[in-house]
């Protein structure tokens, strides 16, 4: 069974514990990991150093050009190299932004795919999602991504993962095209997504095409959004809500109706040219039904948020739901739906 963590509602200490157990387990042979940003006193790196000292083969891909963290990452790289960890610095012209872990054991491998950095500080302030799986095709392809990082211009055919700059945009367009075709055939057709930014022209134009064909598109977009919803004949089937609340919304979740057999993806990539063309990013499918239900709950709560949500209307107004309030203020406030508070209470009670 797959496992998932939704930070900060779940503690990042659980992930640290996984790394620490891997570092001392006699069953574990190797650990591979991508690192983009690290905490000042990173427990992640300390666990990896412990693993190397215990004889595990540890490989770390670290991005030296992570904005504002260049000096920190250089220092951590030196410490890891001194401990016997094989450190890879990526490829000129491509930032390594994917969030991956591969743990090789004697009886099968485990991989982690995350939407956010393996950073204790971020995990207390950012909403991010991590899945852990032993699904063999995904495990093989995550391992192939590490090979791809070392030889990025070698052709690789990914079937499970969507990987940029390899084929992510092409595969996303194919998924949207399938929704258009299904709508034309009278089948279930919709797209639900939660991202930080949408600015990629090709994907925006494809979403317009899908909307014009009648595909329902519901988006939660926190930051930059070049897509204009609600334009008759173009985007009237697109609705966008943006949430600014206590935690920074950072997870990327994508759900496609697929004629009633929904397809779910999570990963590190926003729908921006830089993510699709100039970074190594990964979106991974999610097959576990319980995790799928959790992801759908997260996205749907995001659409419903009227307490901290704002309507992205294409006019640049970012109108807040139910504002201005009219008396009695307390009654209107009580009726508002706050997605982060709702998720917190539901996770707390499970």
Tell me what each language-model feature is:
Residues 17-21, 47-50, 145-149, 176-180, ...:
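Short hydrophobic/aromatic-rich motifs at helix boundaries and adjacent loops
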Residues 54-123, 135-139, 165-350:
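PLD/PLD-like phosphodiesterase catalytic module centered on the HKD motif
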Residues 1-30, 109-175:
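Active-site cores of enzymes that catalyze phosphoryl transfer or operate on phosphate-rich substrates
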